[in-house]
Amino acid sequence: MPVEVKLYTRADCHLCAEAKATIETVAEEVDTPVTIAEVDVDTDETLRAEYGERVPYVFVDGWPAFKYEVDAEELRRQLQDA
């Protein structure tokens, strides 16, 4: 079963673009199947209130994993351990 990586983001967020690029690169490198779900917090009032400016925020397999920056080595470890 694939591991879900959920990326909470918003438009015009350079850190979000960097996080997405790191996630996509690592997902291609690991043997574990990965699905990536990108959620724009500005499309939902509840999410906008919850995350505010605190994006990117990344969940791996349902657990909070990264805020602002994604560490490629740590993400790789989390995906392999999931």
Predicted regions and their residues:
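Haloarchaeal acidic low-complexity proteome signature biased toward cell-envelope/secretome components but also
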Residues: 1-6, 32-33, 77-82
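Surface-exposed interaction regions that form or flank ligand-binding interfaces
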Residues: 51
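Local sequence-structure signature of Cys/Sec-based thiol-disulfide redox active-site neighborhoods
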Residues: 1-29
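N-terminal, polar/charged subdomain of small-to-medium soluble alpha/beta proteins
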Residues: 67-70, 74
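Active-site loop of classical SDR/Rossmann-like NAD(P)-dependent oxidoreductases
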Residues: 48
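Thiol-based oxidoreductase modules, predominantly thioredoxin-like and allied folds used
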Residues: 32-45
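A short, hydrophobic beta-strand/beta-hairpin element that forms part of a small beta-sheet core
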Residues: 55-65
